[in-house]
Every structure is written in C-alpha cells, then in structure tokens.
From Swiss-Prot:
Cellular component, GO, one term: P-body
Record function comment: RNA-binding protein involved in post-transcriptional regulation through transcript degradation of SRE (SMG-recognition elements) bearing mRNAs.
Assembly and interaction partners: Monomer. Binds to RNA.
PANTHER family documented for this protein: PROTEIN SMAUG (PTHR12515:SF5), STERILE ALPHA MOTIF DOMAIN CONTAINING PROTEIN 4-RELATED (PTHR12515)
Extent of Polar residues compositional bias: 150-162, 316-335, 385-415
Other noteworthy facts: Present with 3200 molecules/cell in log phase SD medium.
The organism of origin for this protein: Saccharomyces cerevisiae (strain ATCC 204508 / S288c)
Family of this protein: Belongs to the VTS1 family.
Domain SAM: 451-512
GO MF terms held by the record: flap-structured DNA binding; mRNA binding; nucleotide binding; RNA binding
Compartment(s): Cytoplasm, Cytosol; Cytoplasm, P-body
Domain characteristics, as noted in the entry: The SAM domain is essential for RNA-binding.
Name assigned to this protein: RNA-binding protein VTS1
C-alpha cells in the first residue's frame, strides 16, 4: 500500500521545498492520527525516509493545539535535515520521556505529551542532538536541587515554577511541605543562623541598609510584632548599661587625735590660702591642733552668711568645747535675751531656770523672801542656771516660824512701792527689788476680803482649790493661815502644788493681818 504522500512530486516542485508563504495551508492536509502509528516498510530512497518521518511527526489540528508558526518552524527544520536519517518514532518517544523525568519544563523548552495519540510534538531545538545535550546540561545544573513532582510527567509547570500563586495557597503548600519534609526545619534554622551571623559582621550603615530592605517587604502583622518587640526590649530595665560607680575620694587622715571640731577646718592647708578663707563653714575659735594637715577639707563648699565677731557673743557661749551648731544658735539668738521682758516676745518664764525647785519641800520661814528673790533673779537672768532655794531640812518650831514671818513682813513694809491697792504682790525682798506680778488668784484684795475670810469654801474657790473645802472648812481663817505643810498634808491636802499655793496665800493674809489692813468685820 502506498503512502498518501507519495503521490506528491519530488524535487523543486515538491510542496516541501517551497517557501513558507507559498503554501500556508499545506501542512493542514495531513492524514488522520491513526496513520502515525504505522511504520514505513523500508523505503530505499532517502527522500522517502524523510517523507515518512515527516508524516510520522506532523499531526492533524485535532490532535494538538500548536500555533501555525510553530508547526511551520518544525516542518522547515525537518526538510532542511532531510539528508540525514531521522530517528525512528519509538526512539524519539523514549528520549522524550527520559528528558521529562530528568528536568522540569522551562521557558525555552515546552513539552506536550499525549498518551492517547501515542505521539509527541517537540520543538525543533529538541530534534538536534547537540542542542538537546546542551539544553539538558544547562537545565539540570539549575534544577538539580528541586524534586520533581509526579504531576509533571505531562509537562505541567510545577508549584516551584515562575507562575505566582495566591498567598493563602503558598502558606498552605509551605506548611504541607514542611510537614512532609523533616529536613525543612533543620535547613530553615541553619539559614536563620547564617543570616544572623552575616548581619552581625556588617557595620552600622550596612545594617541600616539591610533593615530598610527587610522592613519594606514584611507584612503588616510582622511589622506590628516587630514594633511590639522593640518597645518591650526598650522598656526592659536590664538592657540599659550599668552606671559606673562614682565615689568621692577618701581623704588620707592620720591617726593623730583631733582636739575639737575646729581642727577639721583649721588644719587644712587650704585655710592658709587667703583666697579660700571665706569658704570655711566656721572660723577658728580654738588653737591650732598638733596634727598633720589632711589632703582634702570637709564641707569647704558651704559658706556661712551669718558670721559674727567674737565680741558680740555673750559670756555663756565662750566655751571652746561647744559644737558649731550650738555656736550658730547662740550667735543668732544672743541679742534677744538682752531686751526687757516686756519687749522680748521669746521671753522664757522662770520655770525654765529652776522649775524643779518648786517640787522640793521648803521651809515655811523662808517662803516669802525666797519667792520674791527667785522671781527677781529669773527676770534678769532667765537662762542662768540657779540652784534650788528650797532644801529638804527639818521644819522649825512654832515660835521660830512666827519670828521669821515677822521679819519677812517688816522688810516689805519699808518698801515705798507697797500698797493695798496694787494689782501685784507687795511682797518684796529686803534688797529693794521691784515687785513681780502674780496670778490673779493671788490677788491680796480678794484674799483679804472679809466675806471670803468668813466663808472658807468660797475663799478656797477663789484659789481654785474648792475640792479641799471639806477638809479645811471646819478651821477658822485666823488659825488656818498659820498651818504648815505637814499639817495641811494631815488634813487631807495631799497634792504638793495645792499645799504650796495655800502656803503662799497664807503668807499674803498674814502680811495684811500684821499691818492691820484687813477689815474688822472679818474677825
């Protein structure tokens, strides 16, 4: 049986030797696809062999989807190589399958396999053995590291190709590939370590450039995580470098005994410098100590704005053993005590000097005189420490008590300022000092009132001692004023302050009685 193409003439008039534009539709006049599986039964001429190969490789339009230009290129290449014996169809199919299993399809090599037709159409570059070897070598070098999927036998591009996939599918495929491949996690950690080591070897400017490029391609959620991570690391206290320890130099002091506080300032060599004399806290009030000067003065940066001369200080503050704080207190307040009691707002009462003297038993005979002298002394010398006027001695007899009281009141009469209408106490000392105002309850006019003297409870109420009315109301006032401390205690006046107050009031009444200044109606 003759081949369908044998009826065409050969030579220059053959349609295979014509130019491409002369017969654009000649390639479409191919037989059915079933005729391709038939082999040529040994033709003697080379042209017949070439024609059989052409008919075996060219398919009808129904069996493939190649464009017209690709088909014309394939036909012209086959006609140009008609002088050489083409490979049989089965051998070409075997080579094509080996090529597909060895490498992935690229942009330059496009392979389409059709198992139903049992034939394949490849690019003209694949027909040349040299081109085939060069292409396989170049593609295998680049694609050796990738694993070929079984789905690529038909020439379908794999997932690792240049076709972009959606981000969700990529993440799913990456997670699936990591689960399927146990070495993926190890390789990923190695890549991270290599990247970190490479970045650590860069300088600051290079690292800034790398971070600019990395941040520009990160997703929004990764950028938020990075920002949160940076804020957390920045706010952590242990990231900040530790502060260097700053300590003041320790002065080199010798074991020489320091005599007083002034030697700390006076022994420094800086004190001898006239420029630094104003920087001292206190002036030198004591002699220079016999000690080696220290290397660094203490408190040399503190100045005292209230420096005073030594002559302005009172005699009380002239002790060299006082500490500087006491000196400063005395310097600032020494002038206040030179004023009179009426002009001094900070005047201290006599209780600051010898208040403890009132809480000791005293003699009844010296009560009036010591009371006046004590007040006069505390008036002019409020800060001077006085001794106790009242000592714990034996009490005199009744005759001695009367004599001593008579002496006290006789000395009071000789004073020209004494009078019954005076609001102050008329009892003064024999040296002629001025009287001191007493409490309102000790007013002689109220104490010598005849109505109060006849009514002992009311008289005690004027002294704010009405709680002792039951103990003293049965005694007349003439006998009551001569009671001593022990008798009052036996009668029930147990408070020491109450007994002293009664004894003072008794002395005033006795004074008025001896001078006949009490109204006769009181008797």
């Amino acid at each position: 049986m003759k081949h369908p193409y044998e009826e065409f003439p050969t030579g220059s008039k053959s349609p295979y030797n014509m130019s491409r534009g002369a017969h654009p539709g000649a390639v479409l006049l191919s037989p059915q696809s079933s005729a391709i599986n038939k082999n040529n039964p040994g033709s003697n001429s080379g042209n017949n062999q070439g024609n059989s190969s052409v008919t075996a490789n060219v398919l009808s339009p129904q069996s493939h989807s190649m464009s017209l230009n690709d088909m014309l290129d394939q036909q012209s290449f086959m006609l140009d190589t008609a002088g050489t014996r083409a490979q049989p169809l089965q051998q070409q199919q075997q080579q094509q399958q080996q090529q597909q299993q060895a490498s992935l399809p690229s942009l330059n090599i496009q392979t389409v396999s059709s198992t139903a037709a049992g034939s394949a159409i490849v690019s003209p570059m694949m027909q040349s053995p040299k081109a085939l070897q060069s292409t396989l070598s170049s593609t295998s070098m680049y694609l050796d590291s990738f694993q070929r999927s079984p789905n690529n036998i038909l020439g379908i591009p794999s997932q690792s190709g240049s076709i972009p996939l959606p981000q969700s599918r990529q993440s799913q495929q990456q997670s699936q590939s990591q689960k399927n491949d146990p070495n993926m996690g190890t390789n990923f950690s190695q890549d991270i370590n290599q990247l970190c080591s490479w970045i650590s070897m860069l300088n600051s400017s290079q690292q800034n450039t790398v971070m600019d490029n990395i941040l520009s391609i990160l997703n929004d959620d990764v950028l938020k995580y990075t920002k949160l991570k940076i804020e957390t690391l920045t706010n952590t206290p242990f990231i900040s470098p530790p502060l260097p320890a700053i300590a003041s130099p320790i002065p080199n002091r010798d074991d020489t005994q320091i005599l007083n506080i002034d030697s700390v300032f006076s022994s420094s060599p800086i004190t001898n410098d006239p420029e630094n004399t104003d920087n001292l806290l206190y002036q030198n009030w004591s002699p220079q100590p016999h000690s080696i000067p220290i290397s660094q003065p203490i408190y040399d940066n503190i100045t005292d704005a209230s420096q005073r001369s030594k002559s302005a200080e009172p005699h009380v503050n002239s002790s060299p053993n006082l500490i500087p704080v006491q000196k400063q207190f005395n310097n600032g307040n020494s002038t206040k005590y030179k004023k009179l009691p009426s002009e001094n707002p900070n005047y201290l009462s006599h209780s600051l000097s010898s208040s403890h003297s009132f809480f000791q038993p005293k003699k009844r005979s010296n009560m009036g005189n010591e009371y006046n002298s004590h007040h006069h002394h505390s008036l002019h010398h409020p800060l001077h420490n006085t001794t106790s006027y009242f000592s714990n001695t034996s009490r005199p007899s009744g005759t001695d008590l009367n004599k001593s009281n008579q002496n006290v009141f006789n000395n009071t009469i000789t004073h020209p300022n004494a009078g019954p209408t005076s609001a102050t106490s008329t009892s003064t000392s024999s040296n002629g000092n001025t009287p001191l105002s007493s409490n309102s309850s000790m007013n002689p006019k109220s104490l010598t009132d005849p109505k109060l003297l006849k009514n002992i409870p009311m008289w005690l109420k004027s002294l704010r001692l009405h709680k002792y009315s039951d103990a003293l109301s049965g005694t007349p006032w003439i006998e009551l004023i001569y009671l001593d401390d022990e008798t009052l205690e036996k009668k029930g006046v147990l408070a020491l302050g109450a007994r002293r107050k009664l004894l003072k009031a008794f002395g005033i009444v006795i004074d008025y009685k001896e001078r006949d200044l009490i109204d006769r109606s009181a008797y």
